[in-house]
């Protein structure tokens, strides 16, 4: 009896010991696997990994964002109507643009600088920082900024005027993106930046000749890249025609973007400061203008302001004027006849019916565009 009891106790101890050894062995293996996993570089399960999931509370929808989504980029030389364009798109319930990020053109310019320097290119390649690595990092950075600096929406757009100096590169990073290149009479753009003291890197605001020369160089760079990616990806939008005939141009533009028509794009001024509407910056120079409905008040303000010697040499100083369809010697120019509604809007603007709302009243800083 005692012998049988000892035998049972011995068997029980053996079973317990076996289970304990098995458990400890399994635990050790799990720890080893976890250590190995942590030592491996992080891998994305999906090459189209979502940067952000945004929730539209009102519509009870969740949106996911990735590099293959149909992003919209608005650009051009500053003072060419880029803010008006983004405000009109922002009024659409399915589109969110938001204020200028300012960081996007700077990081793109940095990437261009690295690419142009053969010595720097060799150094980066030797360090394993290849074009593929940089492009992947740029995709993630740009998308993160575009997505997270505003509210979620089915369609996202970015408006940083000089970002389109890297238009072909952006088209490669985001294969389904569309580009809107805002074009304006260079004489009007330059007069606006000089009279409103909008400092732009490289532009001498004391010289119409210098500013027109720099305007010509900048718009030529963006225009050539727009032509390179083709009409299916890039659309030229003449500021003058947009303000003269907004409905015609917005219908054409939304069709180009494959976004359904919505009448609210013609009344962006009614959506300012509203949820899901147009968010404006207190420090951007165009804010006091886009609070007003589309009007023709700014079209010919440059007439009589440009020095005679510059006017005489205009075709040589700014050959892109003629290429874009402007008469370099027309003074004043004839941009066309506005729609009746625009004439009414302009009359109301001149009467002073539209004033800067209190929540936007803050003295603007000196704005510099790079």
UniProtKB/Swiss-Prot annotation:
Cytoplasmic side of membrane: 1-8
Catalysed conversion reaction: L-tyrosyl-[protein] + 3'-phosphoadenylyl sulfate = O-sulfo-L-tyrosine-[protein] + adenosine 3',5'-bisphosphate + H(+)
Binding site for 3'-phosphoadenylyl sulfate: 79-83, 184, 192, 196, 239, 286-295, 301
EC number from the UniProt entry: 2.8.2.20
Ranges of the Lumenal topological domain: 26-370
Modification note: N-glycosylated.
Gene Ontology molecular function, alphabetical: protein homodimerization activity; protein-tyrosine sulfotransferase activity
Domain of life where this protein originates: Eukaryota
Active site: 100
Gene Ontology biological-process entries: post-translational protein modification
Membrane listed as a keyword: yes
Entry GO CC: Golgi lumen; Golgi membrane; trans-Golgi network
Main location: Golgi
Record keywords, A-Z: Disulfide bond, Glycoprotein, Golgi apparatus, Membrane, Signal-anchor, Transferase, Transmembrane, Transmembrane helix
PANTHER family found in the cross-reference section: PROTEIN-TYROSINE SULFOTRANSFERASE 1, PROTEIN-TYROSINE SULFOTRANSFERASE 2
Subunit organization: Homodimer. Can also form heterodimers with TPST2.
Listed name of the protein: Protein-tyrosine sulfotransferase 1
Organism per entry: Mus musculus (Mouse)
Lineage: Eukaryota, Metazoa, Chordata, Craniata, Vertebrata
Designated gene of the protein: Tpst1
């Amino acid at each position: 009896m005692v012998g049988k009891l000892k035998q049972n106790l011995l068997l029980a101890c053996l079973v317990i010991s076996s289970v304990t050894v098995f458990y400890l062995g399994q635990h050790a293996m799990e720890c080893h696997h976890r250590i190995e996993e942590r030592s491996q570089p992080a891998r994305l399960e999906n090459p189209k990994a979502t940067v952000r999931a945004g929730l539209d509370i009102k519509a009870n929808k969740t949106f996911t964002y990735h590099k293959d989504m149909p992003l919209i980029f608005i650009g051009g030389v500053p003072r060419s109507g880029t803010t008006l364009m983004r405000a009109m798109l922002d009024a659409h319930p399915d589109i969110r643009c938001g204020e200028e990020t300012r960081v996007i053109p700077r990081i793109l310019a940095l990437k261009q600088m690295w690419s142009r320097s053969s010595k720097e290119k060799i150094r980066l390649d030797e360090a394993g920082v290849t074009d593929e690595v940089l492009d992947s990092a740029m995709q993630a950075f740009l998308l993160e900024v575009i997505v997270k600096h505003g509210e979620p929406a089915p369609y996202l757009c970015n408006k940083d005027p000089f970002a389109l100096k890297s238009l072909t590169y952006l088209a490669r990073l985001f294969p389904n993106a569309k580009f809107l290149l805002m074009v304006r009479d260079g004489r009007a753009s330059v007069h606006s930046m000089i009279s409103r003291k909008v400092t732009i890197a490289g532009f001498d605001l004391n010289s119409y000749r210098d500013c027109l020369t720099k305007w010509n160089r900048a718009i030529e760079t963006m225009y050539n890249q727009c032509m390179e990616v083709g009409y299916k990806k890039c659309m030229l939008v003449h500021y003058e025609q947009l303000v003269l005939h907004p409905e015609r141009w917005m219908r054409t533009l939304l069709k180009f973007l494959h976004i359904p028509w919505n009448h609210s794009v013609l009344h962006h001024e009614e959506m300012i400061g509203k949820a899901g509407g147009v968010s404006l910056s207190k420090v951007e120079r165009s804010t006091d203008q886009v609070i007003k409905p589309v009007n023709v008040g700014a079209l010919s303000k440059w007439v009589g302001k440009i020095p005679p010697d510059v006017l005489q040499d205009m075709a040589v100083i700014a050959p892109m004027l003629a290429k874009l369809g402007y008469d370099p010697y027309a003074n004043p120019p004839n941009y066309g006849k506005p729609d009746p509604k625009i004439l009414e809007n302009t009359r109301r603007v001149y009467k002073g019916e539209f004033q800067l709302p209190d929540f936007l009243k803050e003295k603007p800083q000196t704005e510099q565009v790079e």
